Amino acid sequence: MTTAPSGLPGTPLPPARRRERPRWPLLVAGAAVLGLIGYMVLGNANSNLVYYVLPSEYQQDTAKFAGKTLRMGGLAKDVVYNRDTLALKFNMTDGQVAYPVQYQGAVPDMFRNDAVVVMEGQMQQGVFHGKSLLVKHSEEYKAADSKGEGQYSQDDLKKILNDQSTKP
């Protein structure tokens, strides 16, 4: 049995007091962790950005995109695909400028001549070497002209390429 300091038997001890810790170190540590996470997310965002351009926009400022991975979007023209080797070659155009494209891999079912495509890759010696291929489509039907080719203006292309609601 414990006794009080006065020595009287049966007198309970007063409840132990906890030493109250200041809360500001915890708040400072939490703010530092949040700041570090924010810096890591936003600081690395620029290095992970992939630029999206049309062929004519690329031609206007080739030095800006030199050596960088970018997304180029436009119409696929003069498509040549070898199913045995999975080698794809075509010209990507926005109606003003065309660049030859090379891609190695499976091609989506919707890919065809005059399809609106987005390629991610790099330009090397005037040829765009794609790493990934995306076929975009408009939600609106656009009839082919008398030559059997789709008619897209540069504004139509931008609208289709920037439309995030369409599935690749």
From Swiss-Prot:
Domain of life: Bacteria
Any one Gene Ontology cellular component term annotated for this protein: plasma membrane
GO MF terms, alphabetically ordered: heme binding; metal ion binding
Ranges for region Disordered: 145-168
Topology term for the membrane: Single-pass type II membrane protein
InterPro entries: CcmE, CcmE-like_sf, NA-bd_OB-fold
Alphabetical list of Pfam families matching this protein: CcmE
Side of membrane Cytoplasmic, spans: 1-23
Topological domain spans for side Extracellular: 45-168
PANTHER family: CYTOCHROME C-TYPE BIOGENESIS PROTEIN CCME HOMOLOG, MITOCHONDRIAL
UniProt record similarity statement: Belongs to the CcmE/CycJ family.
Function: Heme chaperone required for the biogenesis of c-type cytochromes. Transiently binds heme delivered by CcmC and transfers the heme to apo-cytochromes in a process facilitated by CcmF and CcmH.
Name of protein: Cytochrome c-type biogenesis protein CcmE
